[in-house]
């Protein structure tokens, strides 16, 4: 029972990693409250944590030298919760603005640790299974907090931020059930000044490029599917929302299927899932009816979850314990870069054509090519 609770507590850390955008449904109320402030500045509050996440990831190596993994996790969980209470205490725009940056930094502290702690504490098949379930936990967490916002918003937009108080029970679970003895502290101290070799840097950077491409494609799908739904099936925003929700929830199945897929494809899983992901994007671009569009979009969500989890699994396989946290932070930084680059890529492609066949044709072919690059990285680093 103790081991089960330890695993549940570790997986709970991933429950809140992708919840920065959960308060987006409170934007309308925030527009009304902050009259005189441009809507673009209010919308910025939703995406602002991404900047804080980037700061934490960039300085992760130096932060890791000053603080233990346990200190970073506890600090991240406490800051995460406090930033949820700040709008209630002071809803002034500059205060909320600063709190969202700090919120992002807290998520950044948790992001690397939540992934690395699994690779450090579990080995073999158990590690693969746990990494897969970790991806499912992210999906469930985002859905639960988004639903929580919809319930709290009736009490005012400030109350919607209280969903971030979920980190308090997660903190208690972590402190109660995840052991941190003198042996763990000694291992961390031993690895604190270990530096990555040139080969390890190349592997981590290569996988960061793969992760960036995977996330770039996912955000492109999320942003463009509503307009494609209208063009292809004369659907509504509600229809697009249902398709995108299904695309997210299929990530739960992908997480549960990850271990069997790893056993089946072994070191080829990254290229198999990446090529499948690219093909689904090509099919999105040429979909002629709503049913076909819905099916291939949901399949894209499955392939996306498998491909991204595979990146972290490869890192766990290839990187020694002393540099795993730093290598993971590089890969997560790649994910953030891919997300941020989406707007610029779509704008650039839009200067040529905004047709779905062109947009998703580009992203699909890019994903397939990057998948073979990923296979080369995996096999080269495995020698």
Feature roles, as predicted:
Residues 55-93:
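Conserved MFS/SLC helix-loop-helix module at the cytosolic interface between two early adjacent transmembrane helices
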Residues 56-68, 254-266, 350:
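Helix-to-loop junctions at the C-terminal end of transmembrane segments
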Residues 83, 94-102, 291-299:
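Paired small-residue
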Residues 93, 99-137:
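Cytoplasmic helix-loop-helix junction between adjacent transmembrane helices
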Residues 109-122, 306-320:
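Intracellular juxtamembrane helix-capping segments at the cytosolic ends
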Residues 124-125, 133-179, 183:
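Helix-loop-helix hairpin linking two adjacent transmembrane segments in secondary transporters
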Residues 203-245:
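Extracytoplasmic gate region of multi-pass secondary transporters
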Residues 316-354:
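A late C-terminal transmembrane helix in Major Facilitator Superfamily
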